[in-house]
Amino acid sequence: MAFFITFSSCEESLDIDVRDSFACDLVLSTPEQIELLLLTTYNSTESFGAGSQFWARYMNVEIASLEARMNFNAATQAQDRFNVINGWTSSNVGQLGQKWQDLWTYVRQANVFLDLVEGSEAQINNPDEIEALKAEMRFLRANQYSKLLKFYGGVPLLTTAATLDDDFNIPRSSYQEVVDFIVSEIDDIAPLLPLTRESGEFGRATRLAALALKSRTLLYAASDLHDPSMAPQTSNLELYTYDKANKWQDAADAAKAVIDLVGDRDLISTPNAKAYQELFLSANEDILFARPFGGTIFGFGTDVTTQPDNAQSPRGFDGWSLSTPLHNYTMIYNMEDGNTTDSPSFDAANPYENREMRFYANINYQGATFRGRPIDYSISVDNTIVPDGLDSFSQDQQTLGNFRHGSTTGYAIRKFQNEALGTDVKQASPGRPYIIYRLAEIYLNYAEASFRAGDEETARKYVSRVSERALQPAITASGPELLEAIKRERRVELAFEGHNFFDERRWLNENNLGFDVKGLRWTKDLDENVSFEEFTIETRPFDQKQYYLPIPQSEINRTEALVQNEGY
């Protein structure tokens, strides 16, 4: 099986180039050399750039969520890299099919590292330093298992490197067993990790990062998708369910543990949309764990570049508009006064007036000023007289911007864009991190878990900290309306960070999993007046099997004990 493969030599097992051709025993002789081996496994964390998952790194799972659709080659709408329109099969989930191999590759690398380091000369001579490095690797392995859980449900639990004498016919562990493993690992290693890091070590594991992983894991486990009485599966329920009486209180306690370490403070203040947008462009105290960027990180080259500007800028800026936000999604953003777009304060004829701050920070809409000019998605009624908009997907504008990548929804992602780069969107943005865990998520985790545990006062307090930072009113709702307010805050605050794909699933919200994908079509008349109409771009199907990805059929065929996810 692909995820059990190992090799006979030390160098092959670690699958890296050992500097200066050191023999394995020399590599394992000092903490400094072992640290170099550890650091390559940080390539397991998410990124904006190119690597073995080219498409799945230039865009996140937002293109298969309520947030966005894929927009590559928009003139023909030929690309559906995650296969969300045709529907998933056991042999085709698009680029998501790479997840299984990529996630297991780093689990194996972690297991090999931990086995080789155990009893090494470096560990004998420097036990405390080596235990700290092992704790980092165990954190990275636990993070991989958390992703395997989200995509597949219960998976085989492998904690040592396999040898040729081992039994490869290993069944999947239950969902609850994998959750318990992650939590146990975090409880063991958190005291061994530093609380925070100096700026030169930004991006390495900390106690806060480990506890944030525990918080997310327990929140997901407690959710409706994994409740035995609500799970959509009809067989092998142990692969998908979590059945602990105090699960919501456990999730609340895990989030509170992070908050207590941070100091139970307000989030970084953002007086306007520009300040909010800049939260995502550099390291700051609200970030608990992120992947840093640069030509080299910690002295070794990485397999990524930092490309959100190129991938997500509108076409007229030579961008790809790769993940175009859905009109359905943009309507979730409130008005400036805190009312919804269903309220009288929303002007349907001027949908972008008086919206909440995060709308302007996250979304590139028609008429928004971006990199020095207004965005224009409009298509002329006669482009021989009045030209099409620079950012449209008109096939007649081949000389303007990036011809193939005009937005088909009438939107593009503004979040993560560094406008200080000017018009050269292909250059790297120095210091911009890919954020994996941050404090606002923990506050929302705490609010949701507290509500479900029966503590509405705490839920209101912490969801309001997030909404008020965005200049929205404090949340005063109670009961089901409070839970919906918490969910809305997650959809908006955590936009395009890889959460919504999983959130809607764990909430069993199928209305936001299968639906008509809406956009706004902008038209320019001969007097250059612009108008719009809402239209349906496509219908996105959803089948209950799509709560999880299929395990690659090749793995199922090889291994009798490995059970396929239901429906595939």
Where do the PLM segments sit?
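Bacterial N-terminal signal peptides
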Residues: 1-6
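Long, intrinsically disordered, low-complexity segments
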Residues: 10, 103-106, 181, 272-334, ...
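An aromatic- and glycine-enriched ligand-binding surface/loop that stacks and positions planar moieties
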Residues: 11-81, 155, 187, 207-211, ...
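Short, well-structured active-site flanking segments
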Residues: 14-17, 149-160, 226, 453-465
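Conserved, well-structured interaction surfaces
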Residues: 23, 31, 35-51, 73-152, ...
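Active/binding-pocket-proximal capping segment
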Residues: 377, 381, 421, 440-446, ...
